Amino acid sequence: WIMGHMVNGLEQVSEFLNLGANAIEFDIDFDQNGVAKITHHGIPCDCGRLCTKQTVFTEYLDNIRHVTTPGDPKFREQLILLALDLKLQRIPVEKAYAAGVDVATKLLDHYWQRGKSKARAYILLNLPLVQDYEFIRAFKDTLKNEGYEQYNDKVGVNFTGNEDLDEIRKVLKKVGVDKHVWQADGITSCFARGTDRLTEALKRRDTPGYNYAYKVYAWTLVKYSTMRRSLRLGVDGVMSNFPDRVVEVLKEEEFADKFRMATYDDNPWKKFTG
C-alpha cells in the first residue's frame, strides 16, 4: 500500500493518484464538541508541504465516493484505501465518543449512503492516542444502532502515536477489537527515526495468533534510503509525500520480485503469507 500523505484538498486527490498512490490519508479536524468539520492538518506539518489546505468533511466524502465507485465518471480503480487521520488530540478526551458517532454517521450519510452507494474503498481509522479508544466504541455502536453493521467489514483501526505496543493491545482488547488492525510507526518527514519499534511491530505481525497488527506501515517517508530500509524490514505499506518515489524504489531489482502494488483484491485485514 502506497499512502499519499495529507491529501486534504479535493484537487490533491487526483494529484496523488497520478503520482502512484493507491491509498490516501487525510486529516479530520473537529470542533470542541467532537463534530467533524473539515479536512485540515494545520501548522506545523511536514517539511516542504503546505499545511493549510482544507475541505468541508462532508464535501470531501461526497467527492471521494465518486472516485471510489466503479462505473462513475470520476472512478479511479487504483484507490482502494482511505486513511482518516483523526485529530482527536485537539479535543477533550471525553468528546472522543461523540466524535466516533459523528464520523460514523457522516460516512453512512455521505460515503456509503446507507446502502445506496457502491463506493468500495476500505476505511482505516487512524487514532493518535490510546486514550481516545472510546471513538472506536462509538463508531461501532453507531453502525450497530443504525442497522449497518455490514460496514464493519470495510473498516479497520490503527494507532499512530508510536505508543507502547502492549498498551495498544490492551486498549483494543478493551473495546473488543481483535481483527482489522493495522499498526503504524513513524515521524514527520522533518526528522530521522530509528527502526526499533517498527521492527518489533513487524515481529508481532509475523507471530502466529497475534491479532493486533495485520498490516504494518511506516510514515512519512520522503528519502529513497528510508523507503529501502523499511522495505527490507518487510513493511506492508509506506506513507509518503512522494508516492512516485516509492513506485520507483519498488521497481528496483532488489524489490521488484518481492513486492507489488496492492489491488482491490488484496484483503487489507489479512496477514500476507507469501
Swiss-Prot record:
Its cofactor is Mg(2+). It comes from the Eukaryota. The keyword Cell membrane does not apply. InterPro entries: PLC-like_Pdiesterase_TIM-brl. It is an enzyme of class 4 (lyase). Disulfide bonds join 45-51, 47-190. The active site is at residues 5, 41. It is found in: Secreted. This is Dermonecrotic toxin SdSicTox-betaIIB2i. The lineage of its organism: Eukaryota, Metazoa, Ecdysozoa, Arthropoda, Chelicerata.
